[in-house]
């Protein structure tokens, strides 16, 4: 049913998709408007260039899915598997990712504005060459977000909260950091070579 709708209409509008097996689905360039997706397998699916607006994904697998160049606005993802997702060059605005896993996820060259990552594991996630504006990373369960070995090299971060984040062995080499909050963050082994930091808050005694 969902596949037929996708083929006939090139996307979904106002639909609820639940308990569907859609792994490896080809949905490049598709349009998703006010869609609710629950307990659905979209792993390794191709959603490159898709336009996703005012939609919610819950308990859904997007492992190794391709979201390259996709556009998201007012999208919320709850308890989703985003491990190894390819979200390079993604454009996301007013989005929230909660209770999910996005380890080894790729956001290279992405533009994220007013985005929240809550209780989401981002170990080894890549944000290199990306633009992050008013992005919040938080995890009340762990005391701070999990971003060990994350890659922010060459990225531009503006008004970003990484308060109490675990950023051990993360790299910010060549990054531009404006108004970034690193208060109480764990920065052991983090690489700030060539980074420019303006108006940032770092842990006491730390100098990038």
PLM regions and their residue ranges:
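Tandem repeat scaffolds
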Residues: 7-208
